[in-house]
Swiss-Prot record:
One of its GO terms (biological process) is mRNA processing. One of its GO terms (molecular function) is RNA binding. Keywords: Abscisic acid signaling pathway, mRNA processing, mRNA splicing, mRNA transport, Nucleus, Repeat, RNA-binding, Transport, Ubl conjugation pathway, WD repeat. Acts as a component of the THO subcomplex of the TREX complex which is thought to couple mRNA transcription, processing and nuclear export. Component of the CUL4-RBX1-DDB1-DWA1/DWA2 E3 ubiquitin-protein ligase complex that acts as a negative regulator in abscisic acid (ABA) signaling. May function as the substrate recognition module within this complex leading to ABI5 degradation. Functionally redundant with DWA2. It comes from Arabidopsis thaliana. Belongs to the WD repeat THOC6 family. It comes from the Eukaryota. Component of the THO complex, which is composed of THO1, THO2, THO3, THO5, THO6 and THO7. Interacts with ABI5, DDB1A and DWA2. This is THO complex subunit 6.
Amino acid sequence: MYGDATNWNEDEYRESILKEREIETRTVFRTAWAPPARISNPDAFVVASSDGTLAFHSLNSLVSQSASFGYSKGQDVMVAEPERVVRAHEGPAYDVKFYGEDEDALLLSCGDDGRVRGWKWREFAESDVSLHLKENHLKPLLELINPQHKGPWGALSPMPEINAMSVDPQSGSVFTAAGDSCAYCWDVESGKIKMTFKGHSDYLHTVVSRSSASQILTGSEDGTARIWDCKTGKCVKVIGSQDKKSRLRVSSMALDGSESWLVCGQGKNLALWNLPASECVQTIPIPAHVQDVMFDEKQILTVGAEPLLRRFDLNGALLSQIHCAPCSVFSISLHPAGVVAVGGYGGIVDVISQFGSHLCTFRSSSL
């Protein structure tokens, strides 16, 4: 017995196949829990993806939807429609941060188009932006555009991408790690560059703010991490080998709450530094390349090019490892309540409780 082909539409079928493949090959580069962080029960978080979108999801809604779906380690996961979505960038959105800790915070994102864009979080969360609208109907409140370098005869360089951001609301600053091997300090009020940090020989992967010492730290493809003085723009210390033959890119870094300890992801290793002593006190080997790292008080969380979330103590002892749904994980986001959201290849986000159980696993619908 054969099906009825009278209503067959080849164009619609082709479009549906392409859409399905696009969703399955999307990458989540960053997840971020929304303020106010003081709320003990986490709910709202934002997902930045390779299709340039920012999607806002409600954890409570996702958990109720996934109750009947179950946990999947493969690509067969629940597809969830976000509460709100906006196309933030032309090209991938690489990072998302909240500037401020209350409902008046700014939602900031950066991406491959060399721009930082910002929205009022309250307006973003309450906006009526339809998932099915192709155009961006929620205009950014803030837009910072990377400078282009002028060459011979006035020719401008391509727009360098922005791979990561860090925020310092105390000084009114946003720091960006760019593809032109420079880091930039932006004034949020004026939208102007306050300082340019030059010294790396290759593009930057990451930047973190150390506000207690008026410093930033950057990690680069050139295999080094650098500490910079925000008052002078000068590099005060270079961390890591400068030997081009043995260097491995510094892909991620994080500071602890005291801003005395720094952990760097470099190749298949974590390097733990005591900053006041300027000493690397621990090197922790990892089976796969590190792609994100963060502190949870006196412990280190890390993910990489494998479907595992690992937790270490400061002595390098492995405390736990939890299997997660993305086959390659690019992002960890920790809520103060202990809930972790990881995102990665396939556009998959896996939300894990403080006890190690999977609260929900999903793929966000796209524009």
